[in-house]
């Protein structure tokens, strides 16, 4: 991000930009998102968008980072709540969680996956990888002490 929002109003503007971007990705596809479209969907002027982000790629990267962090945390929470569950059932549950996540956010994650080659080295990919590693280590330690 170009400028980190400090005040509540600025944080709300950034959140509106990110929500507008998510809507654009779901509606137009990530390759057809433009800053004017983000402006229209978010209700934030193009000039204000550029106060916080250098370009649309940076907006998408920030959105994907936040969504990836939330997704990873949700998976960890889901797995850790399964105290008396067989590992096979946790695997099935985790796969179902993954497919449900793909369908959530009006196709946002499906659109990102279609273009994963552009994001596979992103900070968001590293965040997901770290969460998956932590889940795997937790399960390994629990079932194979």
Model regions and ranges:
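Short hydrophobic clusters on alpha-helical segments that form packing/core surfaces
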Residues: 17-25, 67, 71, 98
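Helix-turn-helix
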Residues: 12, 16, 24-58, 62
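Charged, amphipathic alpha-helical coiled-coil/dimerization segments
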Residues: 80, 104-110
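Amphipathic alpha-helical packing segments from all-alpha helical-bundle domains
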Residues: 69, 73, 89-96, 100-104, ...
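N-terminal intrinsically disordered/low-complexity leader segments
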Residues: 1-12
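Amphipathic alpha-helical linker/stalk segments
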Residues: 63-90
